[in-house]
Amino acid sequence: RATEKSVKTNGPLKQKQTTFSAKKVTEKTVKAKSSVPASDDNYPEIEKFFPFNPLDFESFDLPEEHQIAHLPLNGVPLMVLREERELEQLLHLGPPSPLNMPSPPWESDVLQSPSSILSTL
């Protein structure tokens, strides 16, 4: 019976202690919230220092004068350049001419006989 009495007396005391500590916690959070300074009022010049527009960094479109959607590009092969040197050679070729054009490596010589073509494969 002594254990029953101690349990009965300890039960309400524990409840009072938990509510008391909960009040302390809420008081601490209220104090913490009131002590935080408002960021907009104290530092307005910082936001003007670095102008930032996130839309500037998310635009992947070409300007209107460089749009290529209206061009018929069906059948145009994709050019994959292995080195920067090949790109520089393409840029410095000038206007295309059938006499000066080097033959692409994927085209075979038209004058070759079929047997020589098969032997190279």
Swiss-Prot record:
Please describe the post-translational modifications of this protein. Answer: Phosphorylated by CDK1 during mitosis.
Q: What's one Pfam family the UniProt record gives for this protein?
A: Securin
Q: Where in the cell is it found?
A: Cytoplasm; Nucleus
Q: Where is this region: Disordered?
A: 1-24, 93-121
Annotated Pro residues bias: 95-105
Identify the residue span(s) of motif SH3-binding. 95-105
- Which GO biological process annotations does it have? cell division; chromosome organization; DNA repair; homologous chromosome segregation
Record GO cellular component, one term = nucleus
Q: Where is this motif: TEK-box 2?
A: 26-28
- What are the GO MF terms of this UniProt record? SH3 domain binding
Q: Which residues carry this modification: Phosphoserine?
A: 97
Q: Which UniProt keywords apply?
A: Cell cycle, Cell division, Chromosome partition, Cytoplasm, DNA damage, DNA repair, Mitosis, Nucleus, Phosphoprotein, Proto-oncogene, Repeat, SH3-binding, Ubl conjugation
* Regions of compositional bias (Polar residues) in chain numbering: 110-121
What positions does the record give for the motif labelled TEK-box 1? 3-5
Q: How does it assemble?
A: Interacts with the caspase-like ESPL1, and prevents its protease activity probably by covering its active site. Interacts with p53/TP53 and blocks its activity probably by blocking its binding to DNA. Interacts with the Ku 70 kDa subunit of ds-DNA kinase. Interacts with PTTG1IP. Interacts with RPS10 and DNAJA1.
Notes on the domains: The N-terminal destruction box (D-box) acts as a recognition signal for degradation via the ubiquitin-proteasome pathway.
| Record function comment | Regulatory protein, which plays a central role in chromosome stability, in the p53/TP53 pathway, and DNA repair. Probably acts by blocking the action of key proteins. During the mitosis, it blocks Separase/ESPL1 function, preventing the proteolysis of the cohesin complex and the subsequent segregation of the chromosomes. At the onset of anaphase, it is ubiquitinated, conducting to its destruction and to the liberation of ESPL1. Its function is however not limited to a blocking activity, since it is required to activate ESPL1.
| Similarity annotation | Belongs to the securin family.
**What is this protein called in UniProt?**
Securin
Q: Which organism is it from?
A: Sus scrofa
